[in-house]
Amino acid sequence: MRRKGVRILAIFILICINISIFSRVNADTINVALESEEYAISQKSLTISRIIPKTDIEEFKQQFNLEKEKVHVYAKNGTTEMKNGVIGTGMKICFDNIENEYTACVTGDINSDGEISQYEISKAIKHVVGLEAHQLSGINATAIDVDGDGEITQKDVSILIKYVVYGKLDINGKKTPTAP
């Protein structure tokens, strides 16, 4: 009878240990809601847009509700982690504790160098005048829609030109970006 009591006690202790081990919440697997006051985050298209041209990668990492060590920026190919330089359109953004991979969309940048140049102005003009072979779509259309109104228009071209000539980016003074 005493042996039976010891066995029951041993089984009870093992069950308690297993419950204790398997019921612990591992902080590394909790999904966190991604937030930023600087950038527009789209869960639908998995993009982070409204990134100002020439934004340093370290500065970019500090603009989220996570520690910068938990933000990882990868080259457009998705394999090489970028530790310095500027963020460019098409770069891949991963976060510890968040399953989704996001794509960076720098305002006005479509050649992935993180800047606005005559190349982007030329592409925007060709799109606006309707040249069929030069119509922008996807992340490039989002990048060239610098005023964020959902369309690429002469106003966007004008803003791009002013930026290249004067170095000022006028994007409606938006403090809180909206996702496309």
Describe each region flagged by the PLM.
Residues 23-29, 37-180:
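Cellulosome-associated attachment modules in secreted, modular CAZymes
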Residues 2-26:
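Sec-dependent N-terminal signal peptides of Gram-positive bacterial secreted proteins and lipoproteins
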Residues 8-13, 33, 130, 135:
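Acidic/proline-rich low-complexity IDRs
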